[in-house]
């Protein structure tokens, strides 16, 4: 069975974009692959989160993953910092990484531009740590978005370079994995782009009905169509895209027909969209609250996930040490 690895930084609650863009695919993948899903708390240290927030954010993501249906009996769910072997492999890969290639990565240049007063070594070597996360389990597939494709190419480069330096065929070159039709891009509520964690742009799986309704009713629209069958402007198309995802085909066609004959009332569209989002998220939200209240269950998932992840990582690291010459 092929091994798949995917990580998420614990920087905020999961939203509809996370669910339809990734998690829904994970629910299928956990039955077909040897899956390792981890919460990347080490990666979050580049932005220096408050110590009190680290554990809380990890527990939040863990509870939300479980509430969505990721099964710890079928997939290994673990916290990155519980697998110390990753740091040792990170060290070895850094010894074979070159300053110039790390400085040229788009992700580093973009983050350095956004936070010029915090251009730390963790940002620079982000691709190396990401490669260690993947290669520690000798994964062959990694579900990532286009924004991570360059880092995936770096991971393949580091795997290939290790094999070349030590004249072995040990690390596979991991492939970027597209989940296919199950992955959907969910637009944000601010009129453009995909849904993200910025304030006002996202609907979180843990949001209650009142919060969801308030966010949807504030979504950007225009004055309405004046010409039948006209092209929808991006903010309006975004609302229809969300409607297509969470509503029935009948509901979508109803509002599409109203738009095309210039009789649509955006208030009615937003009310329907909010109601359908609430209907979808309410069972997940209730499950999140239930899981968060069960500290013993969360502790057990973390402990057992760490044990399974470390067992896999230790096997890889033992061979890596032998190949390098630590015997």
UniProtKB/Swiss-Prot annotation:
Binding-site positions, ATP? 9-11, 17-18, 145-147, 186, 194-198
Q: Recorded GO terms, molecular function?
A: ATP binding; tryptophan-tRNA ligase activity
GO CC term, one of those recorded: cytosol
- Its principal location? cytoplasm
The protein's Enzyme Commission number: 6.1.1.2
Per the record, the domain of life is: Bacteria
Tell whether ATP-binding is among the UniProt keywords: yes
List the subcellular locations: Cytoplasm
Tell me the residue numbers annotated for binding L-tryptophan. Answer: 133
| Chain span(s) of sequence motif 'HIGH' region | 10-18
Q: What PANTHER family does the entry give?
A: TRYPTOPHAN--TRNA LIGASE, MITOCHONDRIAL
Biological role: Catalyzes the attachment of tryptophan to tRNA(Trp).
Q: Subunit comment for this entry?
A: Homodimer.
Family per similarity comment: Belongs to the class-I aminoacyl-tRNA synthetase family.
- Protein name in the entry: Tryptophan--tRNA ligase
Q: Which organism is it from?
A: Porphyromonas gingivalis (strain ATCC BAA-308 / W83)
Name of the coding gene: trpS
């Amino acid at each position: 069975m092929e091994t798949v690895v995917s990580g998420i930084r614990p920087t905020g609650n999961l939203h509809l974009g996370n669910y339809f863009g990734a998690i829904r695919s994970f629910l299928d993948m956990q039955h077909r692959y040897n899956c390792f899903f981890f919460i990347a708390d080490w990666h979050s240290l580049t932005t220096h989160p408050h110590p009190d927030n680290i554990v809380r954010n990890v527990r939040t993501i863990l509870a939300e993953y479980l509430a969505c249906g990721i099964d710890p009996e079928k997939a290994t769910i673990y916290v990155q910092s519980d697998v110390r072997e990753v740091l040792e492999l990170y060290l070895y890969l850094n010894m074979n990484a070159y300053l110039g290639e790390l400085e040229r990565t788009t992700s580093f240049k973009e983050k350095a531009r956004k936070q010029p007063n915090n251009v730390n070594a963790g940002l620079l070597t982000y691709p190396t740590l990401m490669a260690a996360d993947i290669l520690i389990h000798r994964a062959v597939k990694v579900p990532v978005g286009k924004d991570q494709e360059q880092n995936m190419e770096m991971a393949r480069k580091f795997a290939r370079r290790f094999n070349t330096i030590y004249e072995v065929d040990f690390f596979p070159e991991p492939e970027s994995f597209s989940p296919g039709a199950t992955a959907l891009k969910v637009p944000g509520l601010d009129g453009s782009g995909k849904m993200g964690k910025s304030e006002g742009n996202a609907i979180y799986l843990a949001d209650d009905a009142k919060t969801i309704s308030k966010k949807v009713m504030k979504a950007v629209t225009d004055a309405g169509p004046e010409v039948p069958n006209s092209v929808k402007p991006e903010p309006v198309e975004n609302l229809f895209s969300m409607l297509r995802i969470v509503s029935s085909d009948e509901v979508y066609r109803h509002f599409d027909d109203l738009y095309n004959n210039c009789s649509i009332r955006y208030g009615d569209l937003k009310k329907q969209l909010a109601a359908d989002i609430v209907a979808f998220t309410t069972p997940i939200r209730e499950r999140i609250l239930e899981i968060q209240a069960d500290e013993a269950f969360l502790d057990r998932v973390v402990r057992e996930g760490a044990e399974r992840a470390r067992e896999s990582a230790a096997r890889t690291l033992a061979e890596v040490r032998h190949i390098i010459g630590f015997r």
